[in-house]
Amino acid sequence: MSQASTEIVRISGHAGTVPGAGLNREFQVCKLVDTTTCIGCKACEVACLEWNGYTFSETTFDNTYQTMPETAWNYWNLIKFNEHERADGTMMLLMRKDQCMHCADPGCLAACPADAAIVQYANGIVDFQEANCIGCGYCMTGCPFNIPKFDPPSRKVFKCTLCNDRVSVGLEPACIKACPTGCLHFGTKSEMKELAETRATQLRDHSGFQDAGVYDPAGVGGTHVIYVLHDAKNPELYGGLPKDPRIPWSVRLWKAPLKWLGNMAIVGGIVGMALHYMRFGPKKVEPIPPDVSPHGTPSGSQNDERRGQGRPS
């Protein structure tokens, strides 16, 4: 595919948009995951580990096909399994590829106070710059998908980058190259939405899945990873996919009105001190009279005179 723009449009620790240098490409990229054709082979998990330089580790998540309960700081791609009993009593194995959703309105970026620790490129990818991460973990509370994960030894937070290093030079993400069934697709956002809607229509019209649809939640401005689901009305069945994800109200409150009020309070305090100084001047200390001690008692010769008056003649 063509190269997508790596121009920075937003960074953490700054309000509004931030222009940056990048490739002169305007389109936004998108990954489409068709859960109806996923076989749970985990080839995408292996490809993600290998491309990003992480080693395999033994897991203890037994009695399930799933590798581990959730993604980890060094395990960004995870196939989630759920055995769902249908209305007719038959069992259906639902599988979903779990990774960063690369939201158009990312909660992690909104919550992060560190300068340029999180960046959003013009192609839609949300990337972490670990060198600028301060390890506060606020991004973890801002994400409605529970994706950013903290690494205690390094005190940094990590997540899927949508293989931005590959995408920026015209390559597909590693997980998509490894998929044997073609359930993963990559292209522009408009192309992937059209392909997803076509597939959902096929499922409704020809496969008996009347509730099939596309998962591209509006609560976070849409995402650059979208899903085709058999049952789009109940996304929670697919490994806990939130039905209506939104940035937590606490993050919105802290980053908008409370931050503004705090700044206004600081400015008001500075202005108040300046006005007080201009009206009353610097604080003046009244000098102590030379014949009075700090405790208000007579001093010097007066004390001697009084002591002399009290002596018998």
Q: What residues fall within each predicted segment?
A:
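Non-ligating segments of multi-cofactor redox enzymes
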Residues: 1-313
